[in-house]
Amino acid sequence: MTDDILKKYLKEIPAFLALLRAVEAGFYREIELPDPMLDLGCGDGRFGTLALQHPIRAGIDNEWRVVQEANKRTAYLTVAQGQGARLPFANEYFASAVSNSVLEHIPDIDPALRDLSRVLQSGATFAFCVPSEHFLSFLSVSRVLRRIGLSALARRYETFFNYISRHHHCDSPETWQHRLDIAGFDVERYWYYFSPRALQALEWGHYLGVPALLAKAITRRWIVAPSDANLWLTDKIVRRYFELPLPT
């Protein structure tokens, strides 16, 4: 696919989220994900619609409201409400699965991984994105606080930012590999995909994105005027972070 995924996202969601989702989408497009595929934690279905090949056999999420939104999209053959640890699917049904920025939000992650393993065929591909162990240490505010000797305040800020991000896990590849091994998965490869500069843009986007939150509450749309002309400056600012090389 050669379409401009960043531009598509900027027309639908706040810029800081558009940056993250567009970067993530590029990786899934390079991975072979045979049918039938499961989207674990599909949310409102926007990511599956914009980033994945259609049709997607099934999506599942634990929030009824977003399941209803996902059902309105044409990308999924079926969307179900359910918990990750009790997936309503037969053993060894899916040939692949994705879970984009979802696993970090599940407090008790091990049962969810075990049940996902149950519904996947032998040798099935499971691709997912999660924040790494560097997520908190890369934040600009906590970096400044530590630089001036306010380490305790930096830790409080990191706790606050993790809270508003609803994260339960910001872990290293080694920690994830241990979890996946126990659940029956073999890790083929992993990589870091968001640079410190991009993460700091994401960080400040949380605060600068408040007007979009108000727009969503009033109009039910994140972006009220999604024209190229209206988003020209936003695109120019965000694209410099989108095009950054992968961190080492």
Each predicted region: which residue ranges?
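S-adenosyl-L-methionine-dependent methyltransferase catalytic module, highlighting the catalytic core
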Residues: 107-115, 125-248
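Conserved functional loop/turn residues at catalytic and ligand-binding sites
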Residues: 88, 93, 105, 184
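Residue-level "edge-of-site" marker
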Residues: 83, 102, 193-194
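A short SAM/SAH-binding and catalytic strip from SAM-dependent methyltransferases
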Residues: 98-107
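Conserved N-terminal segment of class I S-adenosyl-L-methionine
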Residues: 1-86, 90, 96-98, 113, ...
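A generic structural signal for alpha->beta connector loops
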Residues: 54-56, 76, 123, 184-187
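Active-site acidic short loop of glycosyltransferases
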Residues: 34, 91-92, 108, 122
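Active-site micro-motifs of SAM-dependent methyltransferase domains
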Residues: 86, 104, 133
